[in-house]
């Protein structure tokens, strides 16, 4: 048993409490000075990044507002850093103070320990005197240690509360920063999506316009091609209007009571020999237009049959007229399908043949009967004059 049977356990208790206060020198917050320097440098750069007088307008104001928000954010972070440094420093001082108090109490007990040991050598009452001496010193030392520890606990609680406040403020700043960043990112994403949607919309509108133009061009091309094709077929003979053309052609050869395919001319078209087409080489003339009229030929042929052929030039002329009349009669009978002679016309009646005398009241033979009339030049209608000699 130790002679300082009260002081020694007290010193051991103080050493245990001292060990609970940590080993080494408490950190004074020097680890946070580097971050504080970073924040201060960022603040200086942000302050220099504000738009000057050469940049005005809404864009400059918007940039200045964003820059001011960043400055405020870094300024608050720097303030939090300073407060945290101060808090850590205060807590470190409290720990160091508590250590010092415990160290002083321990040293005080160690200082009186030899006295307590010496008192134990007094016979009979030495241990009682030593105990009475050690007890007040140990109680005092433990009171001081208890006070130091209480101070440390209170200081720690205060600093912890301040730390929680700083952490809450830091969380708020970080949340605001994240919200700002998220807002910026959301704005960027929104703007990007808006631009992408606008691009897609414009692209779709452009494709629609291109499709409309393409369909319009193709439709116009087919329309013009179809029109050109119709015009082409319309311009080709026989493809359009063929039926109407054939009907007109067949109508030219139609006759009453006869088929249009028989190829016979209509009887009304032969009413006058002057309307017949010219046939070169017939009778030595230029066509039927050069022949005398049918009435003249009929009269000449009738009178030629009642009288013998005259001699001389007059007879030759009459024969020529008779030959032409026979040719006309043959042509008429072939073209009209009627009786031979004078294009289907009937010869004069027997009454006209039986009349051999006539009294003239006009011309050179006026007032004479059974007289021979002088020759008369008759115009045949085709520009050719025919000498006709009428015999009474």
Curated annotation (Swiss-Prot):
Domain of life: Bacteria
Region (Disordered): 302-392
Secreted listed as a keyword: yes
Pfam families in the record: EspA_EspE
Ranges annotated as biased composition (Gly residues): 334-344
Annotated consequence of substituting residue 50 to R: Severely destabilizes EspA and blocks ESX-1 secretion in vitro. Attenuated in cellular models of tuberculosis infection
Observed phenotype of the null mutant: Deletion mutants fail to secrete EsxA and EsxB, and are as attenuated as ESX-1 mutants in virulence assays. Bacteria no longer translocate from the phagolysosome to the cytosol of host (human) cells; bacteria replicate in phagolysosome. Host (human) cells no longer produce cytokine IP-10 (CXCL10) upon infection, but continue to produce IL-1 beta (IL1B).
Effect of residue 57 to R: Impairs EsxA and EsxB secretion in vitro. Modest impact on EspD stability and secretion. Attenuated in cellular models of tuberculosis infection
UniProt keywords, alphabetically: Disulfide bond, Secreted, Virulence
GO cellular component assignments: extracellular region; extracellular space; plasma membrane
Result when mutating residue 62 to A: Severely destabilizes EspA and blocks ESX-1 secretion in vitro. Attenuated in cellular models of tuberculosis infection
Induction description: Transcriptionally activated by EspR. Repressed by the MprB/MprA two-component system, by direct regulation and via EspR. Up-regulated by the PhoP/PhoR two-component system, via EspR.
Main location per the UniProt record: secreted
GO process annotations (BP): Actinobacterium-type cell wall biogenesis; biological process involved in interaction with host; protein secretion by the type VII secretion system
Annotated compartments: Secreted
Note: Maintenance of wild-type levels of EspA requires both EspC and EspD.
Function (record text): Required for secretion of EsxA (ESAT-6) and EsxB (CFP-10) and for virulence. Involved in translocation of bacteria from the host (human) phagolysosome to the host cytoplasm.
UniProt subunit comment: Homodimer; disulfide-linked. An artificial EsxB-EsxA heterodimer interacts with EspA.
Protein name per its UniProtKB record: ESX-1 secretion-associated protein EspA
Organism: Mycobacterium tuberculosis (strain ATCC 25618 / H37Rv)
Gene expressing this chain: espA
């Amino acid at each position: 048993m130790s002679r300082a049977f009260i002081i020694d356990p007290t010193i051991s208790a103080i050493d245990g409490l001292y060990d609970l206060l940590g080993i080494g020198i408490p950190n004074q917050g020097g680890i946070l000075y580097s971050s504080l320097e970073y924040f201060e440098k960022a603040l200086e750069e942000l302050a220099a990044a504000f738009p000057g007088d050469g940049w005005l307008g809404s864009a400059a104001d918007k940039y200045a507002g964003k820059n001011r928000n960043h400055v405020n954010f870094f300024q608050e972070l720097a303030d939090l850093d300073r407060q945290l440094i101060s808090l850590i420093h205060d807590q470190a001082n409290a720990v160091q103070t508590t250590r010092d108090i415990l160290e002083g109490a321990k040293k005080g007990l160690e200082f009186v320990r030899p006295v307590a040991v010496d008192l134990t050598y007094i016979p009979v009452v030495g241990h009682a005197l030593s105990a009475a001496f050690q007890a007040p010193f140990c109680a005092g030392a433990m009171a001081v240690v208890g006070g130091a520890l209480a101070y440390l606990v209170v200081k720690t609680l205060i600093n912890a509360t301040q730390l929680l406040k700083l952490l809450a403020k830091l969380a708020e700043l970080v949340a605001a920063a994240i919200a700002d960043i998220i807002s910026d990112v959301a704005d960027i994403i929104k703007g990007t999506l808006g631009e992408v949607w606008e691009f897609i919309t414009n692209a779709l509108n452009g494709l629609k316009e291109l499709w409309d133009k393409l369909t319009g061009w193709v439709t116009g091309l087919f329309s013009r091609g179809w029109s050109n094709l119709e015009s082409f077929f319309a311009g080709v003979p026989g493809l359009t209007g063929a039926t109407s053309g054939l009907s007109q052609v067949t109508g030219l050869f139609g006759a009453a009571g006869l088929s249009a395919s028989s190829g016979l001319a209509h009887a009304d078209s032969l009413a006058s020999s002057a309307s017949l087409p010219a046939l070169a080489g017939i009778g030595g003339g230029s066509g039927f237009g050069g022949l005398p009229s049918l009435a003249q030929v009929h009269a000449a042929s009738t009178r030629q049959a009642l009288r013998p052929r005259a001699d001389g030039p007059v007879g030759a002329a009459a024969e020529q007229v008779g030959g032409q009349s026979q040719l006309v009669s043959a042509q008429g009978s072939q073209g009209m399908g009627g009786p031979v002679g004078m294009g289907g016309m009937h010869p004069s009646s027997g009454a006209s043949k039986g009349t051999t005398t006539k009294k003239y009241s006009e011309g050179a033979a006026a007032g004479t009967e059974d007289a021979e009339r002088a020759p008369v030049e008759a115009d045949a209608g085709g520009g050719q004059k025919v000498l006709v000699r009428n015999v009474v």
